[in-house]
Amino acid sequence: MINIKVVIIIFLSGFYFISNAQSIIGEWETFDDLTGDKLSVVEIYNINDIYFGKITHLFEDSLDSVCDQCEDGDYNKPIIGLVIIKNLIKDDDEYNEGTILDPNNGKSYKCYMELIGTNKLKLRGYIGFSILGRTQYWQRKI
């Protein structure tokens, strides 16, 4: 007879994988808009139901190691570890009201995200209205 503890563990671990697959929490690979080359890995996490993202890995040596274009508290901070996504709030299937920092130019933009399937993330950064912006697609790091 199967041990009841084993059955419970298997049952609960299934819920973990299902809920994690439907969440933006995790590591995401970012890509260059023109070449499609991998640029970085961003870890998205949540604190008190507010979502943030920080760069954990760079694929290209050509990227500056510090954010010398950033302003205020992010000026000259190392790119690795830099929190570039701030204050996203889940609203149904989208994550809104946040900002994203472009460490190449030091500018922050309003942003929203939407999970497409389980392993693709649509991210839109914009100024003012969402039609004035740029969309990127990130791939879940597996």
Q: What residue spans do the PLM features occupy?
A:
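Bacterial Sec-dependent N-terminal signal peptides
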Residues: 1-23
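Short, hydrophobic/aromatic-rich segments at coil-to-beta transitions
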Residues: 22-27, 91-98, 119-122
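K/E-rich alpha-helical interaction surfaces of small helical-bundle regulatory domains
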Residues: 24-37, 136-141
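Central antiparallel beta-sheet cores of small beta-barrel/beta-sandwich binding domains
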Residues: 30-32, 37-102, 108-109
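Short polar/acidic secondary-structure junctions
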Residues: 33-35, 103, 114, 128-129
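Generic beta-strand structural signal
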Residues: 46, 90, 115-116, 140
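C-terminal/domain-terminus segments
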Residues: 103-119
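Edge beta-strand at a domain terminus
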Residues: 118-120, 127-142
